[in-house]
């Protein structure tokens, strides 16, 4: 299932939560000056470079071949840089970035469609993971989103614990469908159906 957050709730975010966030934020600041910023129009090329730096130090850079990274040159960086050159798509993009002593340390990247925000990617530098930089940035990003008129955030599926901590609840079910042409392709698909099911990717 997907996870969604209704930003129109009167009791979100709770004051107690924001007060609790001050403790890890204080310790995070021990690593250097914190700069929380929101990416503006015309800043995407530099922003994607900053996101790529974070991804390079994150688990996806350390424990995988990096091909699934969203913003690196060896990942999907070319796609997003190309998309940002389209003024309509660029106008839908939204992002928040945390730098510590000038070094990119966490980011959140989303697409806005009317009053709904769709989360695309987020990551953080594991060197400061114990102080929850990603969660702290997420709260700031969500508060900023509500102020900008966003009413609902859709995080998609996966990582339910993190999303529920931020206040998300289960949303619509997500299903992947593979459509094939009638005839030979359909017959071949039927033959491979059992192998596909056994792979656990249903």
Model-derived features with residue positions:
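Short, surface-exposed, polar/charged, turn-prone segments marking secondary-structure boundaries
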Residues: 63-66, 80, 126, 138-139, ...
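Short, surface-exposed linear patches
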Residues: 25-27, 58-61, 120, 127-132, ...
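General N-terminal targeting signals
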Residues: 52-53, 97, 121-122, 127, ...
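Active-site/acyl-donor-binding loops of N-acyltransferases
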Residues: 1-12, 148-202
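Acyl-donor binding region in acyl/amide transferases
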Residues: 111-167
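Noncatalytic linker/hinge segments flanking ATPase motor cores
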Residues: 13-20, 41-45, 76-81, 136-139, ...
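Low-complexity, flexible helical/coil segments
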Residues: 12-13, 39, 70-77, 130-135, ...
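A conserved beta-strand-loop-helix scaffold within acyl/acetyltransferase catalytic domains
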Residues: 1-130
């Amino acid at each position: 299932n997907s996870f969604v957050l209704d930003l129109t709730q009167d009791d979100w975010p709770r004051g107690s939560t924001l007060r609790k966030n001050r403790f890890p934020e204080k310790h995070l600041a021990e690593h250097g000056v914190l700069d929380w910023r929101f990416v503006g129009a015309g800043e995407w090329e530099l922003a994607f470079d900053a996101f790529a730096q974070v991804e390079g130090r994150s688990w996806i850079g350390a424990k995988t071949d990096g091909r699934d990274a969203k913003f690196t040159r060896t990942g999907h960086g070319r796609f997003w840089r190309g998309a940002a050159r389209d003024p309509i798509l660029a106008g839908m993009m939204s992002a928040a970035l945390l730098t510590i002593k000038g070094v990119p340390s966490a980011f959140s990247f989303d697409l806005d469609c009317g009053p709904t925000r769709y989360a695309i990617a987020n990551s953080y530098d594991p060197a400061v993971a114990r102080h929850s930089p990603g969660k702290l940035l997420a709260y700031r990003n969500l508060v900023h989103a509500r102020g900008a008129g966003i009413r609902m955030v859709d995080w998609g599926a996966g990582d339910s614990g993190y999303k529920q901590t931020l206040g998300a609840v289960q949303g619509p079910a997500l299903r992947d469908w593979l459509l094939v042409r009638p005839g030979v392709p359909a017959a071949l698909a039927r033959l491979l159906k059992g192998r596909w099911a056994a792979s656990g990717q249903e």
